[in-house]
Structures are given as C-alpha cells and as structure tokens.
Amino acid sequence: MGLSFKNNVNKISIESNRLFHAKNKNLEKVFDKFIVSAKKRAQSNIQQNKSVDNGDLRNSLKVTRKKNKNIKQWKLIVNSVHGAFVEFGTRKRANPPSSLTSYANTFRGMKGESGDVVKRLTDYFKRKGFSEDGIGSAIMDVLKNGTKPHPFFFPAVWYSQRRLPRSIRKALKKKR
C-alpha cells in the first residue's frame, strides 16, 4: 500500500496508489475531508491573525484533486507571492518554527511582488486607518525590521494531520 504526504509553505499534497484505494473506497472521502478542513482552518487562521487586507491571501488557497489510473492526488496550494512572508515573517522579525527553519530560510532575500513597495505600504497603512503622520514611520519600521509572522498554513495542516490517522482507521473498518 502506498500513501505519501508532502508539504512546504505553499502546498500540501497527499498521494495514494491504486492498491491503497482498492482496500477501501472510503479513504477517498477521508482525504477529501482532510484537505478541505485544512483549507478552511487556514482561511480561519488568516482571519484570526488579522492577516486579511483585501483577501488576496485567503482567496489564493486552492484545493486540487487529480485522479488517474494508478494514483490519486490531493493538493492544498497557497497561490500567493506573499504567503511565505505572512507565514514566517520578514527580516529581523522572522520567527519560523524550529522544524521549519531551514525551509523558511529558502525565502530569505526573495523579492515579493514587483512594483513600488513604498506605495503599496502607504496604501495598506491608509486602508488600516493610520494617520498621514504615522504612515512614514510605520513604513520605515517595516523596511528596517520586517513584519511579524502570522502563521496560517502549517498550523492548519498540523491540526488536520493529527486527526487523520483516526479517520483512516475508521474508514478502513467500514465495509466497502
């Protein structure tokens, strides 16, 4: 039987081979539920962390299912340039979990969205209600020190993964 999990900052995928599913058809429902619940929890985390500006990050979470003759695959993808920056933080304030430090380091020095950073930050702080006087110092702080992490993806995946073994056991006990 073959079942594999792979995850990084912008994607989690589950692959299972045909023999694994032949054992029990209920597993497909379990994985569907797992991936959808991870997406909903990640969206909820984004909302709770106050990481929502105009909804780009929240709306960038996509679930895909690919099935062919031998393999079934489920993916949850964060299809946003700034997902890693929100998840781990930036510059001095970056603080990834110890288990993800080496992975988070791959994003150091990476450029986010192209264009005028100061203009984007100015627009952001205006939307957040900052005064004209406070916007300049807030921008300088972000450019110098970075932004705090607001983890949303990995906590959602880990939460859902803790519940997955029990769901798999239940599915395997059910009759076809």
Where does each model-flagged region fall?
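Short, Lys/Arg-rich flexible segments
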Residues: 1-176
